[in-house]
């Protein structure tokens, strides 16, 4: 019985490994007005040709694993995704009060936030796997508001979720 269990686990893990074999991820460092920003790029390296790019805008907590995992999921679905960093300098909130402060600061200085978003979009558009004419943006909470605000402001986006 133990051998069957171990064999089952090995087979299951091999399927998981094969499913993610072509997914490449990398941290992308960039800056705006002296603030260090760190994005997270994910794409399927086993596929050839250009594909749509998707900007993933984090929640009000900051650039965390949730946004990175969404980028990986999008890569598995055939997109190239960049989870961008709207706050910079590794800012992460662990309490709603702090998250609200970060979010309010981003919206209070919208031109700066818009420039950070556009900087990330430029990086995504230049990636070797991306069809720069097919860019979308998704976000959750704060990120959804940013995506919509950018689209309404005329950003070069084909889709917003």
Describe each model-derived feature in a short phrase.
Residues 6-16:
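Bacterial N-terminal signal peptides
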Residues 8-9, 76, 155:
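A periodicity- and composition-biased signal for non-globular, repetitive helical segments
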Residues 17-21:
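Sec/Tat signal peptide C-region and signal peptidase I cleavage site
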Residues 23-25:
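Short beta-strand-initiation
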Residues 117-161:
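Primarily recognizes the serine-hydrolase "nucleophile elbow" in alpha/beta-hydrolase
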Residues 27-129:
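Serine-hydrolase catalytic machinery in alpha/beta-hydrolase-like enzymes
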Residues 1-4:
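Positively charged n-region of N-terminal signal peptides that target proteins for export
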Residues 10, 102, 106, 149:
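Generic anion/oxyanion-binding catalytic loop in active/binding sites
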